[in-house]
UniProtKB/Swiss-Prot annotation:
Name assigned to this protein: Histone H2A
Keywords: Chromosome, DNA-binding, Nucleosome core, Nucleus
The keyword Kinase appears for this protein: no
Organism placement in taxonomy: Eukaryota, Viridiplantae, Streptophyta, Embryophyta, Tracheophyta
GO cellular component, one term: nucleosome
Amino acid composition bias (Gly residues), ranges on this chain: 1-10
Species of the source: Zea mays
Chain positions of motif SPKK motif 2: 155-158
Amino acid sequence: MDSTGTGAGGKGKKGAAGRKVGGPRKKSVSRSVKAGLQFPVGRIGRYLKKGRYAQXVGTGAPVYLAAVLEYLAAEVLELAGNAARDNKKTRIIPRHVLLAIRNDEELGKLLGGVTIAHGGVLPNINPVLLPKKTAEKASSGGSKEAKSPKKAAKSPKKA
């Protein structure tokens, strides 16, 4: 073999990744782009390895996990956006995220034990505490002499 690196086989000197030295470098494509995802597949793979969840991590595991996380994030954001629009707001705040999660049956079950900071609570009034509708009001059909709720609630006591 001479100093140029060409030996008996007649092959030229190899550079990184098996390409010929001096040739055009191929543009790298991330695994997120290959999978059609927005979430970072490489970073999730690094976290899986670093976290020591298992001895070895398969090549498909970070892709699958990134896809699942992206789907969940999109679902929560869509519902939170709807909650913001219902409240005539253009910016999603933690309150909207909480309303979105707690009003959705499956997300509420998944994130049941999660506390969202500055989310507040769901509006809920026990039906027992609501004012009772009287039979007189229902039969009158909306007469002009409608009693106020305080007067309707107070009825003469019978001994």
